[in-house]
Each structure stands twice: as C-alpha cells, then as structure tokens.
Amino acid sequence: MMNVIKPRLKQIKKYTLWDKAYISLKSALLAGKYVPGERIILRKVAQDLGISLTPVRDAINRLIAENVLDRGGVGQGGGASVPLLNSWEFNQLMLIRIGLEPIAAEASVKNATKLEVSHIEKYFEQMKVLAKSRNLSAYLDAHYKFHFGIYKLANQEILFQAIEATWLRCGPTLNLALPEYNPGQKRHKHHLAALSALKQGNGKKLAQAIFADIESA
C-alpha cells in the first residue's frame, strides 16, 4: 500500500481566498513547519489548500514584501524560499523577542478570563506530553499557541503584530534545530511559572517568566 503524504496546510473554503492563503502560510511558518532554505512551490501550496494558484501567488508575494520569504529563482514558477538566517540575524530576532514579549505578557493579565486561561493551560499540558514523546514538530505548534494565547490577551494589536513578525522569521530556524532540541525541565519550569502568574493575575511575574523562557532558548 502506498504511503499517503499528509498536506501541511489545511484546506480552506472558497471565499476570501487571498486572506485565507496568507493566514495559512503564516500559521505554517509560525509553527515551524518549513525549514530554512526550503522551497515553497505555488502549485503544491494551492493543492494543499484546495484553491487556485492566483491567491497563493498573491499571498506569497505579500510575505516576500514583508521580508518573511525570499523570492524564488528563475525557473521556480513564481514560488519562494524560506530565508537562511545567520547567527547574527537570529540573535537580533531573539533580542527583539526579549524586548517585546514581556511587555505583552504583563499587559495580558488584566484581560485573562478563566476560559482563556484554561485554553492556555491546555497548551502547556500538551507541551509536556509532546516533549516526552519527542513529537517535536507538534510541540513547537503547541508552544506557539501557548505564547500567542497569552500575548493576544494584551489587546495591543500593533505590539502583537510586531511579535508575530519576529516569530515568522524565527519559526523555520527553530524547526531546523528540532532534531537536536530537547525541551526539558528548565523550559517547563519557565512555562509553568508563566501559567501560574497568569492565573494569579501577576503581570510582573508573568513578564519575568517569559523573559527567562526566551533567554534560555
């Protein structure tokens, strides 16, 4: 029996296709589902999403304009590739994360409801299980949802967009390091501290936990 390769992008409905293609590609990049240097082929993305080439091309062109992707070379049919970051570029991005994410974390506590905190706690529990099972790709997805679940609560759209833009460029590099990456107790300690601070409504402790988490990456 032939092995069927599952698409990395979820199929979408037939409306607002340009926006949906853009969001789907961003989600895949944020979750580290592409690695640096990997080609993103228009036809393959369109097939995964169940849409035509035009909205996919437009979405990729926007990501290129935002410096998230590099334009594909001659003969790549309008596709793109994921940039290869050097250590200096990656360190710059991590410094930006350290500067921005604790601000969003501290602001999030005033808007955190019990329901929203329960969702974030669910992602934390998923991270623990996935780390033990070495399902690191799924771990990175849960890790992204944990962090952005917190930052979204700040209700500061410009700050949120700046953090997202940084993660869009970090995600693929983090994915590349997955085979050597083992999220252990030190990282769980920071995530647990962040979750506990969120439950307590302690913004300063939450900011400190997020800072420590990024610094230990």
Question: Whereabouts are the PLM-identified features?
Answer:
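Short amphipathic alpha-helical segments with heptad-repeat character
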Residues: 91-98, 178, 207, 211
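C-terminal effector-binding regulatory domain of bacterial HTH transcription factors
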Residues: 1-12, 203-217
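Conserved amphipathic alpha-helical segments that form helical-bundle/coiled-coil interaction surfaces
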Residues: 114-175, 190-193, 205-216
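Short helix-capping and inter-helix turn/linker motifs at the boundaries of alpha-helical repeat units
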Residues: 16, 71, 117-118, 182-186
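Short linear motifs at protein or domain termini
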Residues: 1-106, 110
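A short secondary-structure junction motif
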Residues: 28, 32, 71, 166-173, ...
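A ubiquitous short alpha-helical element
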Residues: 85-91, 105-112, 130-134, 155, ...
